[in-house]
Amino acid sequence: MSRLDVTEKIITAKVMKGLKWADVAAKLNLSKEWVTAACLGQMTLNAEQAKIIAEIFDLSDEDQKWLMVTPCKGSLPTAVPTDPLIYRFYEMINVYGTTIKQLIHEEFGDGIMSAIDFKMDLQRVADPMGDRVNIVLNGKFLPYKQF
């Protein structure tokens, strides 16, 4: 048994039960973005949260314990992603990554955007030419320090 096995059980149960991530998140009173990441194995749940997730997805006590183990974050394969949606993010960073970096440094100075002190919001935006995806990534700026 591994955390990946628990993730697969969660995805299977979600499909079989016809659940939406937003509905799961509402039961935890947390964002759909964070709860989805947690259910997919990228965040650590506390005991109370793990119990709720275990109840929603009919997980065992052993599975529930795996939800509370600190994950190996960013554990996607290191090769270029082949899933079309994930690849588009890879492509966006390849095309716009240096631009984003330059604009952040120009605005804030030398540093990084935190993925720890971080929020994400994903919304559908109606458009007569076809609905659009609006993703806001909100991370604390962390300047490099001199020593």
Curated annotation (Swiss-Prot):
Molecular function per GO: cyanate hydratase activity; DNA binding
Catalysed reaction, written as an equation: cyanate + hydrogencarbonate + 3 H(+) = NH4(+) + 2 CO2
Positions of disulphide bridges: none
Superkingdom, natural source: Bacteria
Enzyme class name: lyase
BP-aspect Gene Ontology terms: cyanate metabolic process
Enzyme Commission number(s) from the entry: 4.2.1.104
Pfam families xref list: Cyanate_lyase, CYNS_N
Keywords: Lyase
Catalytic site: 88, 91, 114
Family classification: Belongs to the cyanase family.
PANTHER family from the UniProt entry: CYANATE HYDRATASE
Role noted for this protein: Catalyzes the reaction of cyanate with bicarbonate to produce ammonia and carbon dioxide.
Protein name from the UniProt record: Cyanate hydratase
Organism: Methylobacillus flagellatus (strain ATCC 51484 / DSM 6875 / VKM B-1610 / KT)
Name of the gene encoding the protein in the UniProt record: cynS
